[in-house]
Every structure is written in structure tokens, then in C-alpha cells.
Amino acid sequence: MTQLSERPADRPAGRTEITGPHQSDVYDVWEPAPHRARGVSVALIHGGFWRERYDRHHLAPLARALADDGFHVANLEYARAGMPGGGWPGTGASVLAQLTAVHADPALPERVVAVGHSAGGHLALWVASADRAPWLTGAVALAPAADLGEVDRLGLSDHAARNLIGAAPDDAPDTWADADPARQRLTTPAVIVSGEHDDDVPASVIESYLATRTPDDPIHSAVALGADHFAVIDPQAPAYLLVLAEIEELTLATH
């Protein structure tokens, strides 16, 4: 992985919710101005190739921007590989539990869109599959590690997928199948937004995932021209307008 954005959020989170006993059981909330509120919660799932050293804080600028544009935003933490409760299936269960907590938060709208970046995009698509969260409004996957088989074939980020699963595909085929949204039925409307010049999650990862979809699957994809892996989470980059438009379109289409 290259570098993560270190730009601080101009406005800090309004509150932080603790959802369990581990340091990963937490999410930060940014609220929109009342006159701009859309009645939709966006739950951000950060990337970092499922590794412990990357946390939610690099998505704070995106959280602030989305709140300024009218969304209630929860920036999720979750258990990554090497942490208590992390690895597979723990990482998936951690994200699903955090999203469920956001959905149940009485101060947030019940309509929840999961927006994940990179490894978080993989997790957003995973939650949107196999009827895991029938209450979820939609999923927006930004530069997602969508096909774990292709991620492993390319050896991305020093074989990050094997680090997540804890084994090679031939040694744990059922675990790989459970973790891979490319091998599961999509049951929640989803959008993929990728950067034209993404070297961290190459286009073949997106293409191989899309090749597993049927014409009836509720998904479409868009490419941010000129964007790299991190431009799709940078509110100061032109790609942000595309990301915002896709979130808006998804929430309107599923209303």
C-alpha cells in the first residue's frame, strides 16, 4: 500500500460511540447542519488491506465533507488481522456488528449506506451479499479489493488476503469462499467507483468481480478519470463529486 491521506478533518466528530470491549468497537459520528440533513446515514469502512496499523482516522476528512453535504456519517472502526477478534471470519463479523449498531443508533437515520474504501470496499460488498444485512439501503465500494482470488493472484500488499484469511486458498477453501463477495450473490444495491490510475487495487480486481455478476444483479460501476487509489476518498479531489453523486443516486433509487 502507498500512503494514506493524513489531512485532518476541519471539524472534529461530534461524538464517539463505544459498541463493545475491544479498541476496535467504536465509531465516530459527524452530523449535518439541520437545514441540510438528508435523512440518510453513511457508514464509512476504512481500508488498509485489513491490517492493524491502518485505522479509521484517515477517513475523517471524507466524513466531514459528507456531513457538510447533508449526510449523517458514522466512521467505523473494526477488528483487523492481528487484532483481538480480527482475521476471518472475525473481521467480517466485526464490520457487520458495527453497521448493525449504526442502524440501531436512535440518533441516526435508519436508512444506512455502507461506503467502503479498498479493503473496506471489499467488506461493504461482503455485507451487501448473501442477505447478511437485509435492512441495508445500499453499498458504495470505492477502489474495492472486490475479488479476493484476484487480490491473492496478484499478491497485493505482500499477500494481504492470505494475511486476512490466515491460510492459502487451497488450505482453507471454505473460509476463502465465505470471505469473497465475488463468489456470493449480491442482495443489496451496490455501486463500485474506481480510479482510472489505481496502482494499489488494479482494474483487473474490479473487472474480475464484475465478471461474476449476472445482468440482474443490482450493481453498476463508474470510473473516476485521472484518479488514483486515494483520490476517491479525498474530498478536495475532483473524484469526490463523482463519489457524492453515486451515493446520492443510490439513496434516491432505493428510497
Task: State where each predicted segment sits.
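Short, surface-exposed "cap/lid" segments of acyl-processing enzymes
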Residues: P34-A37, V42-A65
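Short beta-strand/loop motif that positions the catalytic acidic residue
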Residues: L186, I192-S194
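Glycine-rich nucleophile elbow surrounding the catalytic serine of serine-hydrolase chemistry
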Residues: G116-W126
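Catalytic nucleophile-loop/oxyanion-hole region of alpha/beta-hydrolase
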Residues: R53-A63, A74-E110
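Hydrolase active-site cap/lid region
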Residues: W126-D171
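C-terminal catalytic histidine-bearing segment of alpha/beta-hydrolase fold enzymes
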Residues: E207-L210, T214-H255
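Conserved alpha/beta-hydrolase "acid-adjacent" motif
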Residues: D199-V205
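N-terminal cap/lid segment of alpha/beta-hydrolase-fold proteins
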Residues: M1-H35
